[in-house]
């Protein structure tokens, strides 16, 4: 988490005994950071890809004792879905993988980092060659019903590579009042960023948007949304 990033800001606002949902946890680095920043939070970390999940399970066991790792995707409804897994880019795989867009974003990011074209070509060669995997999908509200039926949700972190709207559309109306903060990476294609922020605002969360300097020129943005204090 960068010093100025929204993940760090969200972590700093956690309270002991908060529930944290880490949706798209990958190998668990964010989950570890949340637990380290605020000991006492209960982290529910969710990751659908089997190889990434095995790393997540081990990391949670070693570094997040007050947490649980679940092997599932999260979307608008319960069921199964086909994901495109990128063995060479395990942080970029998705239910809505788009090889052309993913290649463009990676190339732009590396250019912003100062790499020359030869280095970029070497790094990106076949990086988004994918394979199909079938995974179980649940919803935020189903996760809460099964694993955290009560308590305040201090943070919902979302990093799901173009499935951001699916995740928040899977939150039942009765659960929104429990959620204090949402932080998400959002891919702004098809007006997704505006729709995502509008949905959060419709449930009482004030939204902010930023784009990291290294991601300028890509479709990737960060969203920070929090419920205003009641005093």
Predicted regions and their residues:
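Phosphate/nucleotide-binding beta-alpha loop and adjacent structural elements of enzyme active sites
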Residues: 1-231
């Amino acid at each position: 988490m960068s010093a100025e990033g929204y993940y760090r800001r969200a972590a700093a606002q956690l309270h002991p005994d908060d529930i944290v949902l880490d949706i798209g946890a990958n190998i668990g680095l964010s989950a570890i950071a949340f637990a380290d920043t605020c000991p006492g939070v209960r982290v529910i970390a969710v990751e659908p890809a089997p190889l990434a999940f095995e790393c997540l399970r081990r990391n949670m066991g070693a570094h997040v004792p007050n947490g649980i790792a679940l092997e599932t995707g999260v979307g608008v409804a319960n069921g199964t879905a086909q994901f495109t897994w990128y063995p060479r880019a395990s942080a970029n795989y998705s239910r809505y993988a788009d090889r052309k867009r993913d290649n463009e974003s990676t190339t732009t990011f590396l250019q912003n980092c100062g790499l020359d074209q030869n280095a970029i070509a070497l790094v990106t060669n076949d990086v988004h060659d994918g394979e199909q995997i079938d995974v179980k999908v649940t919803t935020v509200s189903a996760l809460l019903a099964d694993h955290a039926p009560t308590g305040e949700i201090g943070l919902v972190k979302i990093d799901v590579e173009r499935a951001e709207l699916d995740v928040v559309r899977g939150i039942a109306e009765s659960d929104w009042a429990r959620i204090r903060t949402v932080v998400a990476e959002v891919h702004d294609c098809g007006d997704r960023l505006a729709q995502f922020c509008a949905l959060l605002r419709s449930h009482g969360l004030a939204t902010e948007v930023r784009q990291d300097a290294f991601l300028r020129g890509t479709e990737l943005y960060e969203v920070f949304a929090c419920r205003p204090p009641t005093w």
